[in-house]
């Protein structure tokens, strides 16, 4: 049975049993700062389980795409080397929100496995939590499973909880027995880690709420959360022991072999590539782009790990993006969003491949040289240099070291990273601790109507932990029952301001969401003392709020203007709105032309001058979308949404704060347009007084340039062009002089050539020359010395440039490429080329003299 058939049978089975089929949510979870990626089927229903959201159904079924690579759930280092580890996988799940409980959950699972999937009953085992007599009774007396195949587990493996506090409950897991020919013991035994018994389905019974003291309280409406890995059940149905042998992976592994030229389909690198194309393609489909932090950096790590495994197979050209078509063929029908994003996915992956190719070979040279010097442990400073200079994620370096039988000095790397962070830390912005545990009332937001409101302190956090009070100088997070402070969301920065009480003043530096409707006010107690329960006056910084409103409303106008000028393919891919500026990322396949930027800028300013009323209204999500309101990337919307419109020009779903009339914005200037990834552009802009100040600064700079050029401002461009023409002429003359200088140096250097076994060998450094002159000088030496080996080096901008040449009569024994690599490794580089001529670069100029001295010995050893 194919993977696609299993997926569809699962959805159909539960739909016939009253479940609503809910599409997979994106891999970027909405409104959950504790998660990098969606890593289980229940993630999109988390607020339902917590009682913070209500759906129009009480039974649901889904096939959820998931990623585990980064954060708490990180399987990356095992992927490709084990039978069942993946970065991307599909979780089949059925859910009950206060409807059916243990009995139906167990009976549904048993019926599906033994009915539509036709798995023999005697191949299935079950586990229950040791104290869960109710579940055990259902298995024994209703399912009629043999008592010998029911195991009670006393460990936490069979008791699930969402966090230290909150919903939790016992589990019942279902295992498949591959038979006695496979090593391993049943669940709960000492050799349970073997491959004979494989867990295929986990049924979680959420029946308790754990309070801060650890005590369990029965939930009024117990719920069910189940999860079955599609890849695992497919392996069972297709009678294979490794997930990489199922139909879905066979197609991708064969495709990876095709594009890399690898013949051995069991090669682990092919498994890595096949796994990683799924994770990368779906992450990009869901709006993640390669970057240097957060989700973007995890994507970059996965991408570069796949590229390196291709390099390991001998594929030096871009290849990874070629697998997207094969992936769409396999999974596009189940996930039409992947098919729709195919061109964008290919473009993003290809760009990242090209970017990494620029440093991969040189980085590998540094790594190989370091591994050759060190026995088992790669020093932390080398790991950091590979990360910082060559773009090698630390786990990629660890992968390579492990393949060589060694490891990395992670502590040394972290020390280097800490030193870099200390150097870079300038802003000192307070950052909310991720994952603050909170159980209590939500925060009531009043910030649309007022900037000041009376409130009471519900909870205080200091250094990530709950405290009863804080004192002057303490950095803390304050949760209020009511607040006018806007919490960071939808790209808009959180408000700043102060909390005033009779006993202290708390300076709020930032406001962020701890949970969907719980606001954390982060900052420092400037004076006095605050205690849980204190009455405070919450006062938002009015200047920062209004400036942020200018920028947020301008962002809406910008979005609409881009769609009008560039086309309706433009969609928001990310944004940042604060008091100082706005940044807007959008889908577009090419850089904007100067005239397009001006058109967009003019259109936004025209809408500002029209002074539209900025209207807001609440309506049903479906109705808002029908009326043309744009839903934004990365946002999670409830059934009722807030719609912000400016005349008939812009209508968006938005929970942010805005001006009352578009004319309040005053003035809009685009200050930068750039690319952030393939198919994604970024505009940075200013509004109001900041835009005016920027314009005046530009005028001042133009006047300064004009003064230097001794020209009127309107003549500055022509005068500058004339100056540049003169500079180019001077540069040509310098090149001629350099060639003459090199010729003079070569006349004296040629006498330094030594003879080794009848061959003239010359290795020398030249001063004040560029690569072109090096090449010309090399050709001159080869012509004059006849049968010879020549290596020339020079230092420019603190970097080494090398070139090697071997006359044609010697290339059967001596290769210029081998020679240049030998020399380059000594100066921190790597190179390559033809047998008769090769080039390289390096980063250790002080090693150049010694490296050149070693050439004669290399020639003698290789003759």
Curated annotation (Swiss-Prot):
<dbReference type="InterPro" id="IPR003156">
    <property type="entry name" value="DHHA1_dom"/>
</dbReference>
<keyword id="KW-0030">Aminoacyl-tRNA synthetase</keyword>
<comment type="similarity">
    <text>Belongs to the class-II aminoacyl-tRNA synthetase family.</text>
</comment>
<keyword id="KW-0820">tRNA-binding</keyword>
<keyword id="KW-0963">Cytoplasm</keyword>
<dbReference type="GO" id="GO:0008270">
    <property type="term" value="F:zinc ion binding"/>
</dbReference>
<dbReference type="GO" id="GO:0006419">
    <property type="term" value="P:alanyl-tRNA aminoacylation"/>
</dbReference>
<keyword id="KW-0694">RNA-binding</keyword>
<dbReference type="GO" id="GO:0045892">
    <property type="term" value="P:negative regulation of DNA-templated transcription"/>
</dbReference>
<dbReference type="InterPro" id="IPR045864">
    <property type="entry name" value="aa-tRNA-synth_II/BPL/LPL"/>
</dbReference>
<dbReference type="Pfam" id="PF02272">
    <property type="entry name" value="DHHA1"/>
</dbReference>
<keyword id="KW-0067">ATP-binding</keyword>
<dbReference type="InterPro" id="IPR009000">
    <property type="entry name" value="Transl_B-barrel_sf"/>
</dbReference>
<keyword id="KW-0648">Protein biosynthesis</keyword>
<keyword id="KW-0547">Nucleotide-binding</keyword>
<dbReference type="InterPro" id="IPR023033">
    <property type="entry name" value="Ala_tRNA_ligase_euk/bac"/>
</dbReference>
<dbReference type="GO" id="GO:0005524">
    <property type="term" value="F:ATP binding"/>
</dbReference>
<feature type="binding site">
    <location>
        <position position="658"/>
    </location>
    <ligand>
        <name>Zn(2+)</name>
    </ligand>
</feature>
<dbReference type="GO" id="GO:0004813">
    <property type="term" value="F:alanine-tRNA ligase activity"/>
</dbReference>
<dbReference type="InterPro" id="IPR018163">
    <property type="entry name" value="Thr/Ala-tRNA-synth_IIc_edit"/>
</dbReference>
<keyword id="KW-0479">Metal-binding</keyword>
<dbReference type="GO" id="GO:0002161">
    <property type="term" value="F:aminoacyl-tRNA deacylase activity"/>
</dbReference>
<dbReference type="InterPro" id="IPR018162">
    <property type="entry name" value="Ala-tRNA-ligase_IIc_anticod-bd"/>
</dbReference>
<keyword id="KW-0436">Ligase</keyword>
<dbReference type="InterPro" id="IPR050058">
    <property type="entry name" value="Ala-tRNA_ligase"/>
</dbReference>
<dbReference type="GO" id="GO:0005829">
    <property type="term" value="C:cytosol"/>
</dbReference>
<feature type="binding site">
    <location>
        <position position="552"/>
    </location>
    <ligand>
        <name>Zn(2+)</name>
    </ligand>
</feature>
<dbReference type="InterPro" id="IPR002318">
    <property type="entry name" value="Ala-tRNA-lgiase_IIc"/>
</dbReference>
<feature type="binding site">
    <location>
        <position position="654"/>
    </location>
    <ligand>
        <name>Zn(2+)</name>
    </ligand>
</feature>
<feature type="binding site">
    <location>
        <position position="556"/>
    </location>
    <ligand>
        <name>Zn(2+)</name>
    </ligand>
</feature>
<comment type="function">
    <text>Catalyzes the attachment of alanine to tRNA(Ala) in a two-step reaction: alanine is first activated by ATP to form Ala-AMP and then transferred to the acceptor end of tRNA(Ala). Also edits incorrectly charged Ser-tRNA(Ala) and Gly-tRNA(Ala) via its editing domain.</text>
</comment>
<dbReference type="Pfam" id="PF07973">
    <property type="entry name" value="tRNA_SAD"/>
</dbReference>
<dbReference type="InterPro" id="IPR018164">
    <property type="entry name" value="Ala-tRNA-synth_IIc_N"/>
</dbReference>
<keyword id="KW-0862">Zinc</keyword>
<dbReference type="InterPro" id="IPR018165">
    <property type="entry name" value="Ala-tRNA-synth_IIc_core"/>
</dbReference>
<dbReference type="GO" id="GO:0000049">
    <property type="term" value="F:tRNA binding"/>
</dbReference>
<dbReference type="Pfam" id="PF01411">
    <property type="entry name" value="tRNA-synt_2c"/>
</dbReference>
<dbReference type="InterPro" id="IPR012947">
    <property type="entry name" value="tRNA_SAD"/>
</dbReference>
<protein>
    <recommendedName>
        <fullName>Alanine--tRNA ligase</fullName>
        <ecNumber>6.1.1.7</ecNumber>
    </recommendedName>
</protein>
């Amino acid at each position: 049975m194919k993977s696609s058939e299993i997926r569809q049978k699962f959805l159909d089975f539960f739909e016939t049993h009253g479940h609503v089929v809910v599409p997979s949510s994106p891999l970027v979870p909405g409104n959950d700062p504790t998660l990098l990626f969606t890593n289980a089927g229940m993630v999109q229903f988390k607020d339902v389980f917590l009682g913070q959201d209500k759906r129009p159904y009480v039974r649901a079924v889904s096939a959820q795409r998931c990623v585990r690579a980064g954060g708490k759930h990180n399987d990356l280092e095992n992927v490709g080397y084990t039978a069942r580890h993946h970065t991307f996988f599909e979780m089949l799940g059925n859910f009950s929100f206060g409807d059916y409980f243990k009995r139906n959950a167990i009976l549904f699972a048993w019926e599906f496995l033994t009915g539509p999937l036709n798995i023999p009953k005697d191949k299935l085992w079950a586990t229950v939590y040791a104290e869960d007599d109710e579940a055990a009774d259902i298995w024994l007396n209703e399912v009629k499973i043999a008592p010998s195949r029911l195991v009670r587990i006393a460990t936490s493996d069979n008791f699930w909880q969402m966090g230290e506090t909150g919903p939790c409950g016992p589990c019942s897991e279902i295992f498949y027995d591959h038979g006695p020919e496979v090593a391993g013991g049943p669940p709960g035994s000492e050799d349970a880690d073997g491959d004979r018994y494989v867990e295929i389905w986990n049924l979680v019974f959420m029946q308790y709420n754990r309070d801060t003291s650890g005590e369990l309280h029965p939930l009024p409406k117990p719920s069910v959360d189940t999860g079955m890995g599609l890849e695992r059940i497919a392996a069972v149905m297709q009678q294979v022991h490794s997930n990489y042998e199922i139909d879905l992976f066979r197609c991708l592994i064969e495709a990876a072999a095709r594009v890399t030229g690898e013949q051995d389909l069991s090669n682990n690198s092919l498994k890595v590539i096949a796994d990683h194309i799924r994770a990368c393609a779906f992450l990009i489909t869901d709006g993640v782009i390669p970057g240097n932090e957060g989700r973007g950096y995890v994507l970059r790590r996965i991408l570069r790990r796949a590229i390196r495994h291709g390099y390991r197979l001998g594929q030096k050209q871009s290849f990874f993006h070629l697998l997207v078509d094969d992936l769409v063929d396999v999974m596009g029908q189940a996930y039409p969003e992947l098919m729709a994003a195919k061109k964008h996915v290919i473009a993003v992956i290809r760009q990242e491949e090209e970017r990494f190719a620029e440093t991969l070979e040189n980085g590998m040279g540094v790594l190989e040289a370091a591994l050759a010097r060190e026995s088992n442990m790669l020093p932390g400073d080398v790991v950091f240099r590979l990360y910082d200079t060559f773009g090698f994620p630390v786990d990629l370096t660890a992968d390579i070291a492990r393949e060589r039988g060694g490891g990395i000095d992670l502590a040394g790397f972290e020390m280097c990273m800490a030193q870099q962070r200390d150097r870079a830390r300038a802003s000192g912005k307070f950052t909310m601790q991720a994952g603050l545990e909170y159980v209590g009332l939500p925060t009531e937001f009043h910030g649309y109507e007022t900037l000041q409101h009376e409130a009471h302190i519900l909870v205080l956090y200091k250094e990530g932990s709950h405290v009863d009070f804080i004192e002057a100088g303490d950095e803390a997070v304050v949760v209020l029952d009511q607040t006018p402070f806007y919490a960071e969301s939808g790209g808009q920065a959180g408000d700043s301001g102060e909390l005033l009480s009779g006993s202290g003043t708390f300076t709020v530096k930032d406001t962020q969401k701890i949970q969907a409707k719980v606001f954390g006010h982060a900052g420092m107690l400037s004076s006095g003392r605050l205690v849980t329960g204190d009455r405070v006056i919450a006062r938002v910084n009015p200047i920062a709020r209004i400036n942020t409103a200018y920028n947020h409303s301008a962002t809406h106008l910008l979005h609409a203007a881009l769609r009008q000028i560039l086309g309706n393919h433009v969609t928001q891919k990310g944004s940042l709105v604060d008091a100082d500026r706005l940044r807007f990322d959008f889908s577009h396949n090419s850089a904007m032309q100067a005239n397009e930027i001006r058109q967009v800028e003019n259109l936004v300013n025209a809408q500002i001058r029209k002074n539209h009323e900025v209207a807001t209204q609440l309506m049903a999500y479906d109705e808002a979308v029908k009326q043309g309101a744009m839903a934004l990337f990365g946002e999670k919307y409830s059934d009722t949404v807030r719609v912000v419109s400016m005349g008939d020009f812009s209508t968006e779903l938005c929970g942010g704060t805005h001006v009352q009339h578009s004319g309040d914005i005053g003035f809009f200037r685009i200050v930068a347009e750039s690319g952030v990834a393939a198919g994604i552009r970024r505009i940075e802009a200013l509004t109001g007084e900041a835009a005016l100040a920027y314009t005046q600064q530009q005028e001042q700079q133009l006047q300064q340039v004009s003064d230097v050029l001794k020209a009127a401002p309107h003549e500055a461009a022509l005068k500058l062009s004339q100056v540049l023409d003169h500079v180019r002429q001077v540069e040509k003359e310098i090149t001629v002089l350099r060639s003459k200088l090199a010729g003079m140096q070569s006349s004296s250097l040629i006498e330094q050539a030594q003879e080794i076994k009848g061959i003239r060998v010359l290795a020398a450094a030249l001063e004040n020359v560029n690569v072109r002159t090096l090449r010309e000088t090399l050709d001159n030496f080869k012509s004059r010395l006849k049968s010879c080996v020549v290596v020339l080096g020079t230092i420019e901008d603190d970097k080494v440039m090398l070139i090697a040449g071997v006359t044609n009569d010697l290339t059967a024994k001596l290769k210029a490429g081998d020679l240049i690599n030998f020399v380059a490794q000594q100066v921190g580089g790597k190179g390559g080329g033809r047998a008769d001529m090769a080039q390289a670069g390096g980063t250790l100029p002080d090693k150049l003299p010694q490296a050149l001295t070693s050439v004669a010995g290399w020639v003698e050893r290789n003759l």
